[in-house]
């Protein structure tokens, strides 16, 4: 994947909106485009990165050496048993140290919750993480495979994504050798 040159349209302009204390939803249609975009995000920051890899796609690329793993990244591969402890430790980390926190992906996160209403837990966790990252001026990214239906972002399962205020929303689309980033 790294060997193919990809250009990013609007990356620097949109990256300037990804400021400290911000939560950024990254909507995508293609998981490979998402991985390329998140690699670009990771290489553009020098501060520590905590990466929750719920879908294990990025971990697979690192393990196969298709993508070079940055030295400032901690990959977390949660499971149902360790998720709550990992979230607790992450809350402490992002409260004390400026960090890039990446939740990849919202779709995978939902699948970890054994509950009639997983949205309540997932949304509460995102709000709690978002509130705590402000102590250290951290930045959070949440990737999400979704599409806009009837003016609302919707997961492939039909579940609506809760719209929070003060969250940046970006959509990435790839064609040929270019990934376009657009604030939506």
Task: Place the predicted regions along the sequence by residue.
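Structural motif
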Residues: 25, 100-104, 141
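Short, catalytically relevant binding-site loops at active-site mouths
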Residues: 57-58, 107-109, 148
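Phosphate-binding/switch region of NTP-binding enzymes
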Residues: 135-184
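Short, well-ordered coil/turn elements that cap or connect secondary structure elements
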Residues: 46, 68-70, 96, 135, ...
């Amino acid at each position: 994947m790294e060997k193919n040159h990809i250009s990013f349209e609007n990356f620097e302009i949109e990256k300037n909106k990804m400021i400290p204390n911000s939560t950024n939803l990254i909507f995508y249609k293609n998981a490979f485009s998402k991985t390329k975009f998140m690699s670009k995000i990771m290489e553009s920051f020098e501060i520590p990165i905590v990466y929750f890899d719920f879908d294990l796609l990025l971990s697979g690329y690192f393990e196969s050496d298709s993508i070079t793993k940055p030295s400032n990244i901690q990959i977390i591969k949660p499971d149902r048993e360790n998720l709550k402890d990992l979230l607790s430790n992450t809350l402490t980390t992002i409260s004390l140290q400026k960090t890039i926190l990446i939740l990849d992906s919202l779709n995978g996160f939902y699948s970890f919750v054994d509950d009639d209403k997983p949205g309540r837990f997932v949304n509460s966790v995102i709000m709690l993480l978002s509130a705590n990252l402000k102590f250290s001026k951290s930045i959070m990214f949440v990737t999400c495979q979704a599409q806009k239906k009837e003016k609302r972002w919707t997961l492939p399962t039909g579940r609506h994504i809760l719209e929070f205020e003060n969250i940046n929303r970006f959509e990435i689309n790839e064609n040929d050798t270019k990934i376009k980033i657009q604030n939506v």
